[in-house]
């Protein structure tokens, strides 16, 4: 729930709490259940790098480690897995998750759109790729997107969805995972629209530390 509640204004909009209620929300003093994440943003580092080049580097890493790739659609999944043999579906997702958690080398696996509730700790996922902007699922968010695409409310929701995806590969404070962010729409939200400013404190700290390594 940490990513879901990073923006506590949801308590006002969804639960109808007032200002006094907001002052009494129980908040942890730290987020020491979050492991180490190296966050890589290839297009931010080098705007000339192509998606094919990024893909080739990631697939090389997948020869040794388990790499999970989150995409917004099955059409985008084909970029990574043209034959569809490494893409999770409703029919095989439980089997794939079990294989990843077994500790064995599985390699590259693609999850499409819905991945809430999927936890991939340790060797189950050593690199997690978010390729593209996660879709907004609620009717309210889709309405806001249609009438006010530059809305701050919408931007916060989009960043929240990105953070939820980032959390799939790291589940405890002694876990570690490399996060790769890619895709034009995702780049627009995080970079051009300053979505990075809406990361939770812990994620922003890890992002800033990672950025020092690429700069």
PLM regions: where:
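Short secondary-structure boundary/capping segments
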Residues: 11-20, 83-88, 124-128, 142-148, ...
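Conserved RecA-like helicase motor-core motifs
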Residues: 20-26, 82-97
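Conserved RecA-like P-loop NTPase helicase motor core
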Residues: 44-45, 99-188
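Conserved helicase motor
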Residues: 71-75, 87-100, 111-116
